């Protein structure tokens, strides 16, 4: 059962006020991805969880402010826009385990960079934003991305994945 609309509305607005378009149905997903077929598109799977509020949404705001920006930015809300969320995962993210919050950068219709929940939990918005900015700099350009362009955040340099105990398990 979807979350109550009144509960998620403020969480939606944190992204829509940035100019990010909401996708509430599979038709919305098809239209957005069709419009971005030969361009870049940032997909954010929003969530009610604390790591979305304290990490993912602020990181997106910081990254878009820093730039560069994708040609399109869209969001679905897990637990609210159930059909759209399931459809975007099944259609555009095959083989990538579902998680929320979640971000994916697409270039020419293909996912080229993903930030999963496990890359968000226990990390500061600035660190998540830096990962996203690195991806935007690599892929949101007219030039071909460098051969060593990242596809996921590199957490190897941060001990215990952002200070989490080694026994911590993400609930992706």
UniProtKB/Swiss-Prot annotation:
Signal peptide as annotated in the record: none
Region (Disordered) residue spans: 141-172
Comp. bias (Polar residues): 154-172
Pfam families linked: Disulph_isomer (PF06491)
Protein's GO biological process: cell redox homeostasis
UniProt family annotation: Belongs to the bacilliredoxin family.
NCBIfam families per record: YphP_YqiW
Protein name (database record): Bacilliredoxin SRU_0242
Organism from which the protein derives: Salinibacter ruber (strain DSM 13855 / M31)
């Amino acid at each position: 059962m979807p979350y109550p609309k009144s509960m998620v509305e403020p969480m939606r607005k944190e992204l829509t006020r940035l100019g990010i378009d909401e996708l509430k149905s599979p038709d919305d997903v098809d239209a957005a991805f069709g419009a971005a077929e030969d361009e870049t598109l940032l997909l954010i799977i929003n969530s009610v969880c604390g790591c979305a509020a304290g990490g993912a949404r602020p990181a997106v705001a910081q990254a878009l402010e820093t730039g560069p920006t994708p040609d399109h930015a869209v969001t679905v809300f897990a637990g609210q826009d159930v059909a759209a969320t399931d459809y975007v995962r099944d259609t555009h993210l095959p083989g990538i385990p579902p998680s929320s919050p979640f971000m994916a950068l697409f270039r020419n219709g293909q996912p080229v960079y993903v930030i999963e929940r496990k890359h968000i939990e226990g990390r500061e918005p600035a660190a998540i934003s830096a990962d996203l900015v690195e991806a935007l700099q690599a892929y949101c350009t007219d030039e071909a991305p460098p051969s060593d362009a990242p596809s996921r955040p590199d957490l190897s340099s941060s001990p215990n994945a952002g200070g989490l105990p080694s026994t911590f398990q993400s609930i992706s």
